[in-house]
């Protein structure tokens, strides 16, 4: 990916086929422990023929991230491109970020003999963490750093129907607009695209 103003994810529910390729790719690429799902597919109206819609959900890297606002140890930080990351070595596992996140993105692996929470884990937009880029420590704590390699996140790269889009908000917004107009839905549904929802 080239230099962006602000990066975002968008899942086109008209294209998502509930294959779980995105969440499996994420889990495999980052070697996530059992119980930690940085990305998940949710089906709305399940069982209602013709009304089912599936969405791939993860951290949305909010412009004004509520998780960062409630963290008592300030383990969150926002990169210049808008990616919201956290420092696992600062995290105390309190869970405030989970309660604040409208997407349920923060995940807490169990650790210790009594099943206490370990440091929080969440989607990193495949941008690693605060450790040295491509270091063994960064990979162990945060997984692949595809952004440093100029690639899109693995979940979006593996989406066979291109329902899951990742990249700079302007480019994603243009793709969404084109798709909506091609579907014949008109411009009535366009205002909910990233260019309006997330002002830089």
From Swiss-Prot:
Its cofactor is [4Fe-4S] cluster. PROSITE patterns: 4FE4S_FER_1, 4FE4S_FER_2. [4Fe-4S] cluster 4 binds at residues 71, 91, 94, 97. [4Fe-4S] cluster 1 binds at residues 16, 19, 22, 159. It holds the Pfam family Fer4_11. Formate dehydrogenase is a membrane-bound complex, formed of at least three different subunits. One of its GO terms (molecular function) is 4 iron, 4 sulfur cluster binding. Binds 4 [4Fe-4S] clusters. [4Fe-4S] cluster 2 binds at residues 26, 123, 126, 155. It comes from Wolinella succinogenes (strain ATCC 29543 / DSM 1740 / CCUG 13145 / JCM 31913 / LMG 7466 / NCTC 11488 / FDC 602W). This chain is an electron transfer unit containing 18 cysteine residues, 16 of which occur in four clusters. InterPro entries: 4Fe4S_Fe-S-bd (IPR017896), 4Fe4S_Fe_S_CS (IPR017900), 7Fe_ferredoxin (IPR000813), ET_IronSulfur_Cluster-Binding (IPR050954). It comes from the Bacteria. The lineage of its organism: Bacteria, Pseudomonadati, Campylobacterota, Epsilonproteobacteria, Campylobacterales. [4Fe-4S] cluster 3 binds at residues 59, 62, 67, 101. This is Formate dehydrogenase iron-sulfur subunit. Keywords: 4Fe-4S, Electron transport, Iron, Iron-sulfur, Metal-binding, Repeat, Transport. SUPFAM superfamilies: 4Fe-4S ferredoxins (SSF54862). Residues 7-37, 50-81, 82-111 form the 4Fe-4S ferredoxin-type domain.
């Amino acid at each position: 990916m080239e230099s962006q103003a602000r990066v975002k994810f968008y899942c086109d529910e008209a294209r998502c086929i509930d294959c779980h390729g995105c969440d499996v790719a994420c889990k495999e690429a980052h070697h996530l422990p059992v119980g930690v799902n940085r990305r998940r597919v949710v089906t709305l109206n399940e069982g209602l023929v013709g009304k089912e819609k599936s969405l791939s959900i993860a951290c949305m890297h909010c412009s004004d991230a509520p998780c960062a606002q409630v963290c008592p140890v300030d383990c969150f930080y926002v990169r210049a491109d808008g990616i919201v990351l956290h420092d696992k070595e600062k995290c105390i596992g309190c869970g405030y970020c989970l309660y604040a996140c409208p997407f349920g993105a923060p995940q807490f692996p169990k650790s210790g003999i009594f099943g206490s929470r370990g440091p929080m884990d969440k989607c990193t937009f495949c941008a690693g963490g605060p450790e040295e880029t491509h270091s063994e420590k960064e990979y162990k704590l945060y997984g692949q750093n595809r952004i440093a390699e100029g690639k899109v996140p693995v979940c979006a790269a593996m989406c066979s129907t291109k329902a899951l889009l990742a990249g700079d908000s302007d480019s994603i917004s243009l793709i969404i607009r084109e798709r909506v107009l091609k579907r014949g839905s008109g411009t009535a549904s366009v205002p909910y695209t990233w260019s309006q929802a997330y002002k830089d």
